[in-house]
Swiss-Prot record:
Organism taxonomic ancestry: Bacteria, Pseudomonadati, Pseudomonadota, Gammaproteobacteria, Pseudomonadales
GO annotation terms (biological process): aerobic electron transport chain; aerobic respiration, using ferrous ions as electron donor; electron transport coupled proton transport; oxidative phosphorylation; proton transmembrane transport
Natural source organism: Stutzerimonas stutzeri
Membrane-related topology note: Multi-pass membrane protein
A single cellular component GO annotation: respiratory chain complex
Gene that encodes it: ccoN1
The protein's name in its UniProt record: Cbb3-type cytochrome c oxidase subunit CcoN1
Molecular functions (GO terms): copper ion binding; cytochrome-c oxidase activity; heme binding; iron ion binding; oxidoreductase activity, acting on paired donors, with incorporation or reduction of molecular oxygen; oxygen binding; ubiquinol-cytochrome-c reductase activity
Amino acid sequence: MNTATSTAYSYKVVRQFAIMTVVWGIVGMGLGVFIAAQLAWPFLNFDLPWTSFGRLRPLHTNAVIFAFGGCALFATSYYSVQRTCQTTLFAPKLAAFTFWGWQLVILLAAISLPLGFTSSKEYAELEWPIDILITIVWVAYAVVFFGTLAKRKVKHIYVGNWFFGAFILTVAILHVVNNLEIPVTAMKSYSLYAGATDAMVQWWYGHNAVGFFLTAGFLGIMYYFVPKQAERPVYSYRLSIVHFWALITVYIWAGPHHLHYTALPDWAQSLGMVMSLILLAPSWGGMINGMMTLSGAWHKLRSDPILRFLVVSLAFYGMSTFEGPMMAIKTVNALSHYTDWTIGHVHAGALGWVAMVSIGALYHLVPKVFGREQMHSIGLINTHFWLATIGTVLYIASMWVNGIAQGLMWRAINDDGTLTYSFVESLEASHPGFVVRMIGGAIFFAGMLVMAYNTWRTVQAAKPAEYDAAAQIA
């Protein structure tokens, strides 16, 4: 028995995280559709504090970023680090702890946020006891990941692991520094920082939660699963190394662009803007590297919907990372800030890049860890692809139109200097966009239900003996 386990990959924790990625994806995106409907039809708030938009919106963001995105990152990093190091996970019991610990974090978030327990910091709303639990789980994750790298059977550390490693270390630093707080009761604390300093620390964290959790981590996924699915080596390995160092050097500086025209010192705003513009180069370097990996394999897109998911995610990544630096320019930001354009930009990255690359990776990974040849139905993957693409496009386009309309209406003034439009008029103009956004989100959500069915049928058909056979190290 011991011999078998020592020569078999630790796939159990990968299977658990993969299944929970789909589950939390449905929960988080279902919540997203519901709060989108609340904006279109406010009576859906039901006049209850627990179901109000203000409490459910942070629950939605935490569910899709940390529950769906987090589980996807755990599953794919645990899978690819074993494969690229040709060794089993370091401390499999600790890896099991990261699974149960992370699910507990998600559960506590799902209970505390609707009850109104919040630090009020975006993407870091969870109160201090949960912050401590996150830190403990994250340290365990780092030990497992870097421990596995340390006992690798190959000399080289694959580039995907560099991205996963940077994501794990940076998120740890961001989480600890931004959540330094003084507890006053069991579920209430106050930030250690005040005023503009607090805002700066918050958006250094907030932007780099995007930069490292939702970008570097998912680039780790891209660098493993795109070459695997295309059956081609990375287009330029040298470019991938340059991409890595350039990205992690520049990204950490870009946070102030969230605070243009605020009390933040002007030099800090300008620095954030310049760094955001520089960021275009490494971002597009990575996107081009991923796309060009398909050189000689473009024909596969006709018959392989999994590869289509991965390639379209790269296209959305390219689009989002062009749009982000553009929106960081102060003159553009004067129009876009506080409007739905920002929401559209975020979802170009969240639905188009993060969700699509995760879905593509899961469709590749699930059959591998459950000992199946492929997913239950390739046709259903194709259906999911079109639902996801159409849903994303509707979502983004409606928010672009809304955002630019809002920005123009808010700044329009009459000859005597009074505002041309009242806020309510801009809200009325936004209503059709709210409805289209909800429809786009619902279409994307329908795709997740298709994925859940396909995954369930694939898992149901697998036998425990097949799991073991699939986990054997060749």
